[in-house]
From Swiss-Prot:
<feature type="active site">
    <location>
        <position position="109"/>
    </location>
</feature>
<dbReference type="Pfam" id="PF07991">
    <property type="entry name" value="KARI_N"/>
</dbReference>
<dbReference type="GO" id="GO:0000287">
    <property type="term" value="F:magnesium ion binding"/>
</dbReference>
<dbReference type="InterPro" id="IPR014359">
    <property type="entry name" value="KARI_prok"/>
</dbReference>
<dbReference type="InterPro" id="IPR008927">
    <property type="entry name" value="6-PGluconate_DH-like_C_sf"/>
</dbReference>
<dbReference type="InterPro" id="IPR000506">
    <property type="entry name" value="KARI_C"/>
</dbReference>
<feature type="binding site">
    <location>
        <position position="192"/>
    </location>
    <ligand>
        <name>Mg(2+) 2</name>
    </ligand>
</feature>
<keyword id="KW-0479">Metal-binding</keyword>
<keyword id="KW-0521">NADP</keyword>
<comment type="pathway">
    <text>Amino-acid biosynthesis; L-isoleucine biosynthesis; L-isoleucine from 2-oxobutanoate: step 2/4.</text>
</comment>
<feature type="binding site">
    <location>
        <position position="135"/>
    </location>
    <ligand>
        <name>NADP(+)</name>
    </ligand>
</feature>
<feature type="binding site">
    <location>
        <position position="228"/>
    </location>
    <ligand>
        <name>Mg(2+) 2</name>
    </ligand>
</feature>
<feature type="binding site">
    <location>
        <position position="54"/>
    </location>
    <ligand>
        <name>NADP(+)</name>
    </ligand>
</feature>
<feature type="binding site">
    <location>
        <begin position="84"/>
        <end position="87"/>
    </location>
    <ligand>
        <name>NADP(+)</name>
    </ligand>
</feature>
<comment type="pathway">
    <text>Amino-acid biosynthesis; L-valine biosynthesis; L-valine from pyruvate: step 2/4.</text>
</comment>
<keyword id="KW-0100">Branched-chain amino acid biosynthesis</keyword>
<feature type="domain" description="KARI N-terminal Rossmann">
    <location>
        <begin position="3"/>
        <end position="183"/>
    </location>
</feature>
C-alpha cells in the first residue's frame, strides 16, 4: 500500500498559529522546533526543569523560559521533547496537573504513549510530530526554505481536530515542504526501536567491532583494521543514503561488489534474520521497554556497565589516535548533538 504524502497545500498553518505552544526540552529537536515555530508566526515558550543548563541557550536565542509546570499551565499545545526515560515523570509531576480539556500533548517519539507509560485524560488531544532527521538539519533546512520529512500520528482526538493540528505543527517546522507521512504511534515506535537496535546502532556497532577483532586477532595492525571496518563505513553509508544499495554497488569497484555479494550472506544469514525477528518481538510485546524502565529505576546501572564495556574496546583507542591525524574530522563530534 502506497503511503500518503501531505504538503503545505494540505495544511492550515493558522491552526498552530492560533495556539500557545510550550516546547519541553531544548536539546537537538527542541531548539529546532522552537525556532522554526517562532519563524512561522507561532507563540512559543520553553519549559525546562529548574537549573537546566539549556536555559541560558534558550534565553540567548530570545525565548522566554519557564519551569515545565509553568509552561504547561500557560500553553494549550505542549510538545514533550525530553528524553524518553524522563517523560513519564515530567508528565505526572509537571504537565498532567496543568492540562485542560482540549489541550494538545504532542510527542516526537511514540514510546511512552504506545506502551502506556503516559496516559493522558480522554479529553486531551494526543499526537505526534516526528521529523526524520536530527535537530540541526531540521533547522538548517527550514532556514534554507526547505524541510525534513515528518511523520505524524494521532492517539486521542476528543475534538476531531487532532490530525489537522499535528499537520499544521509539522508544516510550521518545515516538514510539509518535504512531505508529511501520517502513521500510527505503534508503527513509529516499533520501527524506530527496531532500526536502532538491529541495524543502525546495535547491529552496525557489533559488525564493526567484530570485524576489527577478526583482523587484529589474525595479526593485522589495529590501524589497518580501523580504516577498513570503521573509517570507510561513512563512504559506503553515504552512497546508500544518496542513491540506495544499487548506487553503492555501482560506485564501488567490481572486486568490492563481487566480494560483497558472495560474503554478505555468510555474515548476515538466515539465523541472523531469525534473531532479528526475536528482537522485533521483544520490542512489540514490551519486553525491551520493561528492561529500559527497570534500568532507569535501578539508577542506570545496566546502561552504565554496558557503556563502560563498549567505550573500553580497543577500537576506541585506535580510532582516537587516527582521528587526530584527520583535519577534516571534528575534534568533538558529540558537540553536534549536545
Amino acid at each position: 500500500m502506497a503511503i500518503e504524502l501531505l504538503y503545505d497545500a494540505d495544511a492550515d498553518l493558522s491552526l498552530i498559529q492560533g495556539r500557545k505552544v510550550a516546547i519541553v526540552g531544548y536539546g537537538s529537536q527542541g531548539h529546532a522546533h522552537s525556532q522554526n515555530l517562532r519563524d512561522s508566526g507561532v507563540e512559543v515558550v520553553i519549559g525546562l526543569r529548574e537549573g537546566s543548563k539549556s536555559a541560558e541557550k534558550a534565553k540567548e536565542a530570545g525565548f522566554e523560559v519557564k519551569t515545565t509546570a509553568e509552561a504547561a499551565a500557560w500553553a494549550d499545545v505542549i510538545m514533550l521533547l525530553a528524553p524518553d526515560t524522563s517523560q513519564a515523570e515530567i508528565f505526572t509531576n509537571d504537565i498532567e496537573p496543568n492540562l485542560n480539556a482540549g489541550d494538545a500533548l504532542l510527542f516526537g517519539h511514540g514510546l511512552n504513549i504506545h506502551f502506556d507509560l503516559i496516559k493522558p485524560a480522554d479529553d486531551i488531544i494526543v499526537g505526534m510530530v516526528a521529523p526524520k532527521g536530527p535537530g540541526h538539519l531540521v533547522r538548517r533546512q527550514f532556514v534554507d526554505g526547505k524541510g525534513v520529512p515528518c511523520l505524524i500520528a494521532v492517539d486521542q482526538d476528543p475534538t476531531g481536530t487532532a490530525q489537522a493540528l499535528t499537520l499544521s505543527y509539522a508544516a510550521a517546522i518545515g516538514g510539509a515542504r518535504a512531505g508529511v507521512i501520517p502513521t500510527t504511534f505503534e508503527a513509529e515506535t516499533v520501527t524506530d526501536l527496531f532500526g536502532e537496535q538491529a541495524v543502525l546502532c546495535g547491529g552496525t556497532e557489533e559488525l564493526v567491532k567484530v570485524g576489527f577483532e577478526v583482523l587484529t586477532e589474525a595479526g593485522y595492525e589495529p590501524e589497518m583494521a580501523y580504516f577498513e571496518v570503521l573509517h570507510e563505513l561513512k563512504l559506503i553509508v553515504d552512497l546508500m543514503f544518496e542513491g540506495g544499495i544499487s548506487n553503492m554497488n555501482y560506485s564501488v569497484s567490481d572486486t568490492a561488489e563481487f566480494g560483497g555479494y558472495l560474503s554478505g550472506p555468510r555474515v548476515i544469514d538466515a539465523d541472523t534474520k531469525s534473531r532479528m525477528k526475536d528482537i522485533l518481538t521483544d520490542i512489540q510485546d514490551g519486553t525491551f521497554t520493561k528492561r529500559l524502565i527497570a534500568n532507569v529505576e535501578n539508577g542506570n546501572t545496566e546502561l552504565e556497565g554496558l557503556r563502560a564495556s563498549y567505550n573500553n574496546h580497543p577500537i576506541e583507542e585506535t580510532g582516537a589516535k587516527l582521528r587526530d591525524l584527520m583535519s577534516w574530522v571534528k575534534v568533538d563530534a558529540r558537540a553536534e548533538t549536545a
